[in-house]
Amino acid sequence: MRHRNGNRKLNRTSSHRAAMLRNMANSLLTHETIVTTLPKAKELRRVVEPLITLGKKPSLANRRLAFDRTRDRDVVVKLFGDLGPRFTARNGGYVRVLKYGFRKGDNAPLALVELVDKPAAE
């Protein structure tokens, strides 16, 4: 029985899925906006939201937890130096998923994933 198993498999092994979501989370936190397929975007939201919540409380333990989940020092620095303070007033809902049409090759539904409080474009 698969009761209470709420994540999407995305047609990948568990290690491949974890690595893919880690890479996508790192890309989103670095660039603050990415385009991917809709099911991946919805699953990515479940990975990134807790990371930003970790970044709101700058402690050594939280930095180590964030590094364990991202494996990227630059992302951890940005998470605790820029993104955490930016989202202190917001209690969740840091990621926006917008439908973005369909991919040309296989007509897969695409989504634009972005952080909600982006700085103004220069």
Curated annotation (Swiss-Prot):
GO terms for cellular component: cytosolic large ribosomal subunit. GO terms for molecular function: structural constituent of ribosome. Keywords: Ribonucleoprotein, Ribosomal protein. Pfam families: Ribosomal_L17. InterPro entries: Ribosomal_bL17 (IPR000456), Ribosomal_bL17_CS (IPR047859), Ribosomal_bL17_sf (IPR036373). Transmembrane segments: none annotated. It comes from the Bacteria. The keyword Ribosomal protein applies. The keyword Kinase does not apply. GO terms for biological process: translation. PANTHER family: LARGE RIBOSOMAL SUBUNIT PROTEIN BL17M, RIBOSOMAL PROTEIN L17. Part of the 50S ribosomal subunit. Contacts protein L32. Belongs to the bacterial ribosomal protein bL17 family. This is Large ribosomal subunit protein bL17. It comes from Neisseria meningitidis serogroup C / serotype 2a (strain ATCC 700532 / DSM 15464 / FAM18). The gene is rplQ.
